[in-house]
């Protein structure tokens, strides 16, 4: 099922853990609508800007899958409102800065950020119906969360070490 021009339901629900453990990771109609909104409002503009495929490393998670991986059943992933992503060839911190300044989102987290490796970690981003998004921006270094994105050195619109 195509959710938007470049994103399918299959890639939004793919989970190696669900496959290995025989967990049904099929979303309901409400979650599918939320995934479609996420694709149109965040993922398509992101793909268009960088002109590169966006890799979804974690999308929808059923309650059973959340339990299997130690995630909360109330996670926005379980509502079809969140994805973890990367764009190969673009530092994750650069993608996070673009998202912060160019799309409406509920929560943006630069996960497992290491200032020595701007391409490391991954980006968690969530979206729900327009007008009710918190625009919360956090960085997680593997131990603690902090407000905002880390300051980086930029040159020519790109992050430099």
Q: Can you say where each PLM-predicted feature lies in the sequence?
A:
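Acidic, His- and aromatic-enriched active-site or binding-groove loops in soluble protein domains
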Residues: 73-93
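Amphipathic alpha-helical interface surfaces
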Residues: 38-42, 65, 81, 91, ...
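Structural recognition of the beta-strand scaffold that forms the well-ordered cores
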Residues: 55-57, 82-86, 124-126
């Amino acid at each position: 099922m195509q959710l938007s021009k470049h994103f399918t339901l299959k890639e939004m629900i793919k989970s190696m853990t669900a496959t290995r453990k025989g967990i049904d990771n099929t979303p309901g109609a409400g979650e599918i609508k939320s995934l479609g909104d996420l694709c149109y409002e965040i993922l398509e503009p992101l793909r268009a800007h960088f002109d590169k495929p966006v890799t979804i490393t974690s999308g929808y998670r059923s309650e059973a899958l959340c339990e299997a991986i130690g995630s909360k059943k109330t996670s926005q992933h379980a509502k079809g409102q969140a994805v973890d992503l990367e764009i190969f060839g673009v530092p994750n911190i650069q993608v996070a800065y673009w998202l912060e300044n160019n799309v409406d989102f509920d929560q943006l987290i630069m996960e497992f950020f290491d200032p020595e490796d701007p391409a490391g970690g991954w980006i968690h981003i969530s979206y729900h119906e327009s007008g009710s998004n918190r625009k919360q921006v956090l960085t997680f270094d593997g131990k603690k969360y902090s407000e905002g994105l880390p300051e980086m050195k930029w040159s020519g619109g790109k992050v430099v070490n």
